[in-house]
């Protein structure tokens, strides 16, 4: 399940509450499942190397399964000898993804897993996350803004709406097409499928395709 919407609308707060990082102002979360959580902002003040960090924080690091399903796809070998403090934003993101995916959990929460990653790295991350979630028969909630990433990884989606910084509410999970039509309709933006790659691409505003899709109520 992916969650998307405007900035400052409550998506990160929602993820933090589910992860137990923050307490809800009303009600309570009944913890009956194991949750692995990758926060939006990644701390980089660790003194050691990336390999030291993995040894300390990634339970399955070093196993054949970890190396084949996580390490190689995320190109972790290129990071191992580097100091965590010296890692770039994209390198920190890959390290954080690896640590989260190394855990045995019922639910995996990812807050903006594509931040600082280039286009190809984002698609690789999507493949890695989806493969592992499916192979473990687990569930995931992913907060992100990248339409291509969301399109690849989502089975269902939640749309957050409201007034940024003041209040927000989430729709119940629905199929991706329904959720995207709701979200993009509010933004007055349409997407089409690229004929070759099948990836979503934004239509030029007020173009023929843009107008045609809006007349049909098909924003996505």
Language-model segments: residues:
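ABC ATPase nucleotide-binding domain signature region
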Residues: 2-6, 12-63, 146-180
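ABC ATPase nucleotide-binding domains
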Residues: 169-220
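Walker B motif beta-strand of ABC-family P-loop ATPases
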Residues: 106-109
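ABC-family P-loop ATPase nucleotide-binding domains
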Residues: 39-89, 193
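Conserved catalytic loops of ABC-family nucleotide-binding domains
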Residues: 128-142
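Walker B catalytic motif
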Residues: 112-113, 120
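Hydrophobic anchor residue at the start of the ABC signature
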Residues: 97, 125
